[in-house]
Amino acid sequence: AEPRDQFK
């Protein structure tokens, strides 16, 4: 999972 995955 990429760090951008934290953006929901």
UniProtKB/Swiss-Prot annotation:
Q: Which domain of life is it from?
A: Eukaryota
Q: What else is known?
A: On the 2D-gel the determined pI of this unknown protein is: 7.0, its MW is: 57.2 kDa.
Name it.
Unknown protein from spot 907 of 2D-PAGE of etiolated coleoptile
**Source species:** Zea mays
